[in-house]
Structures are given as C-alpha cells and as structure tokens.
From Swiss-Prot:
The keyword S-adenosyl-L-methionine applies. Pathway: tRNA modification; N(7)-methylguanine-tRNA biosynthesis. Keywords: Methyltransferase, S-adenosyl-L-methionine, Transferase, tRNA processing. GO terms for molecular function: tRNA (guanine(46)-N7)-methyltransferase activity. Substrate binds at K150, D182, T219, K220, F221, E222. One of its GO terms (cellular component) is tRNA methyltransferase complex. It comes from the Bacteria. The keyword S-adenosyl-L-methionine applies. CDD domains: AdoMet_MTases. This is tRNA (guanine-N(7)-)-methyltransferase. Belongs to the class I-like SAM-binding methyltransferase superfamily. TrmB family.
Amino acid sequence: MTESNDTPIQPEAGDERQHRRIKSFVMRAGRMTEGQQRGLDQGAPLYVLPLADAPVDYDQVFGRSAPRSLEIGFGMGHSLLEMAAAAPEQDFIGVEVHRPGVGALLNGVLTQGLTNLRVYDCDAIEVLNRCIADNSLDRLMLFFPDPWHKSRHHKRRIVQASFAELVRSKLKVGGILHMATDWEPYAEYMLEVMNVAPGYRNLAEDGKCVPRPAERPITKFERRGERLGHGVWDLKFEKLA
C-alpha cells in the first residue's frame, strides 16, 4: 500500500518542471502470478473504471444508491476485499497503480463474486479531481501510505494541506477521512497537517489517534509488526462543512 498514492504538491516556482505535479508513488514493475493475470484478463473489463472528464454517476455504475467509500493505495487488496465482503450493503472504490495489486484484487472479486467494488488503476489525485463529485463520498481511506522518511522527500508525502482540502471537498458533511500508518513520526506529521486543515474535526478523544477501528482489517504485515512490538496509529477526521 505504500507505493501507490499520489500527492498534489507543486514544484517550487522557477523549476523547469513546475507544470508537473510531484507524485508520492514510484512505478515498479512486478511479476504477475497466474491468479493476478486472471484478475486483469477477466476482471478488468468488468470492474476497472476509466478516468472520466466529468464526475461519474456511481449510482448508475453500481446500480443503486448506497454508502460509498474510496481507498487510495489498496496494495494487494486484502483489506479492501475483506471490507467489501463484510459490508455488501455498501459500495467501495479502490485506487491502485501497482498492476500485480490490481490483478490480485480483481482475482479476489471474481472468486468471491463481489458486486459492490470498482477499481481505478491510475493516479488517485486524477481520480479525485476528475471522477468524484463534490460532497459525494461517505469515507476516504488511506492506509499505510509511503512515509517518505528522508526530509528531502517529505514533499512527496500524499498528506499535505492541498490533499486535505481536496478530500474535504469530496466528502459529504459528516464523511470520514480515515488514515493509518505504522510509523509514528508520520502519524505526528499527519496530525500537524490535519489540525490546521479547515472544516475537519478529529474524532480521537485525546485529539490525537483513535483505537484501531473494527472496520479496518488487520493485515499480515500489521500482525507481524505487533509481534515485534511495532505500533500502528489510526487517525479519523470528520468533515464539518
């Protein structure tokens, strides 16, 4: 999940590439398993959505009106599959640029026969800007994004003031931005960004992090980290207006 997010940071003025948006993901080639290739071959025509030039009518896409969540950077798709299977009354949209991950998710969708999940295999910020109508999402999830540890790479982090504002514009009033990270300095950084972002309320009682919500599945990576004494920090912010 850590290499698939995108951030709307702009290069500094005077940069010869200032027309290009700095991205927080790095495209890496990955070897496809048989199942992942099956997912792409059979699932993509059914479940992968193209970038649109106008907001998409997801009621038409899903054939119903239902609570709608979007996850940026779903990695291999295990958590998103589990959430979609556990909540058939809700609709889910996943965004991921890593092709093996997209294939793995789609293979799971086919195997489980899910109908409440659709996928974009492209830049998440492009999806938000071009496809998602304002005030339309009930929840946006960002689990374990790349923290870009080095200071000179912090500009690549997806969580920035401009990202918070873009997400706020897409959430319904009362909608939730749910983030999780396994690196405490990034959790602190997220808090710094969100605490000054207008139009949000931190749902943590202590104004910091919330206990792990039951609706967020625990990944194998997270379980391994827990055995080693590593922490995970969940942050939830509600859109006020």
